Amino acid sequence: MGKEKIHINIVVIGHVDSGKSTTTGHLIYKCGGIDKRTIEKFEKEAQEMGKGSFKYAWVLDKLKAERERGITIDIALWKFETAKYYVTIIDAPGHRDFIKNMITGTSQADCAVLIVAAGVGEFEAGISKNGQTREHALLAYTLGVKQLIVGVNKMDSTEPPFSEARFEEIKKEVSAYIKKIGYNPAAVAFVPISGWHGDNMLEASDRLPWYKGWNIERKEGKADGKTLLDALDAILPPSRPTEKPLRLPLQDVYKIGGIGTVPVGRVETGIIKPGMIVTFAPANITTEVKSVEMHHESLEQASPGDNVGFNVKNVSVKELRRGYVASDSKNNPARGSQDFFAQVIVLNHPGQISNGYTPVLDCHTAHIACKFAEIKEKCDRRTGKTTEAEPKFIKSGDAAMITLVPSKPLCVEAFSDFPPLGRFAVRDMRQTVAVGVIKSVNFKDPTAGKVTKAAEKAGKKK
């Protein structure tokens, strides 16, 4: 085997009926982790259920159903390969918690693939004021997904089919729209596709003779190609933040017989390795890491993106919980926050939000009520310029700079320092009513916390 391919994450966005599932299913089906046996099983079931047309969306429906039932499905099913990358689809919308997942997401997407439907009237519905196309694209940009690919889907159902004029019309309109959000259209590949029939998905289609391919320009250089797969291959690989101080939000804490306390989570920045003295914020508990495991194999060191379990000494399961953050006690350790200042974008709140509003915030793995202590200013979502100082209230569509105060100890960071710990979803009435990006944090002075014997011993050894 040659050198392993780089792993990248994409998120697929777009309006409900744009054909996201079919397109995604097609990629997974053709280049992906679904083995022949599973596909045959799905096809057989599809025929029995009279879904003979089957195609690709069904693959995705099956996977989604399993994911939502909480069956830990083989994540390989959500992966596929390009010439350069292993691609993981981290979430496909349509899932009720999509927005929340995208924010607290187990991972940051490196690129968003926006699917728009070219069918008569369909594109217009998706991009209309209340269509989801706009909201998803804005969210992706706000949350730091700076690369975008646009798939103009259902080219087979334009009038006439595979119409160049329709493709150009959509390209022009979407370009204007994404430019408003902050994307540079010159760096975005627009690919006319049919996710159902497969035109321009993996191979150039002869049914669009007018289409000469896409080409993009960005400061890292130019790229061009014909298909959606080519465009995915042209994604700029992410730099994984290994050099930064460790931040590892805990997803769970287990007590394992014969081993002891094992916190589990994903390394967001930095590295973790046996022998390291870690501090858990906001509780300020410091102890030594005895071992680090991933998929039941012990590691010398874990890096950003790795989901790991690590064994800590002299700390009981009761002292740690989901939402705490592990960090290196000797390198800019994490601390609890007194309050923090954030840009908040209200997505869908039926009323008015004023000072004192206290919804639940989902930030990395933490889930804690926070008070909107002071709405300092309303601002333009795109430029960040102030439009009104100290507004009495804000409502859907507004962006504002707000000071938030957590009701219980909480560990967050500025988005510019640690992106995964600096973005949050505001949940109320069982839905995501707003999203936020943290600009600055007012940290608590750590009160004397618990330092375990193991940490003291290890500290002396150094």
Swiss-Prot record:
Residues bearing PTM Blocked amino end (Gly): G2
Stored SUPFAM superfamilies: EF-Tu/eEF-1alpha/eIF2-gamma C-terminal domain, P-loop containing nucleoside triphosphate hydrolases, Translation proteins
Domain tr-type G: 5-242
Region spans: G1: 14-21
Top-rank taxon, per record: Eukaryota
Modified residues (N6-methyllysine): K55
Gene3D superfamilies: P-loop containing nucleotide triphosphate hydrolases, Translation factors
5-glutamyl glycerylphosphorylethanolamine modified-residue sites: E374
Molecular function (Gene Ontology), one example: GTP binding
Region G4, annotated ranges: 153-156
A single Gene Ontology CC term: cytoplasm
Region (G5), start-end ranges: 194-196
UniProt-annotated stretches for the region G2: 70-74
Chain positions recorded as GTP binding sites: 14-21, 91-95, 153-156
Subcellular location(s) of the protein: Cytoplasm
Modifications the protein undergoes after translation, according to the UniProt entry: The N-terminus is blocked.
Chain residue ranges for the region called G3: 91-94
Family matches, as Pfam families: GTP-eEF1A_C, GTP_EFTU, GTP_EFTU_D2
PANTHER family xrefs: TRANSLATION FACTOR
Similarity comment text for this entry: Belongs to the TRAFAC class translation factor GTPase superfamily. Classic translation factor GTPase family. EF-Tu/EF-1A subfamily.
HAMAP family in alphabetical order: EF_Tu_A
Role of this protein: This protein promotes the GTP-dependent binding of aminoacyl-tRNA to the A-site of ribosomes during protein biosynthesis.
Protein name (record): Elongation factor 1-alpha
Source organism of this protein record: Artemia salina
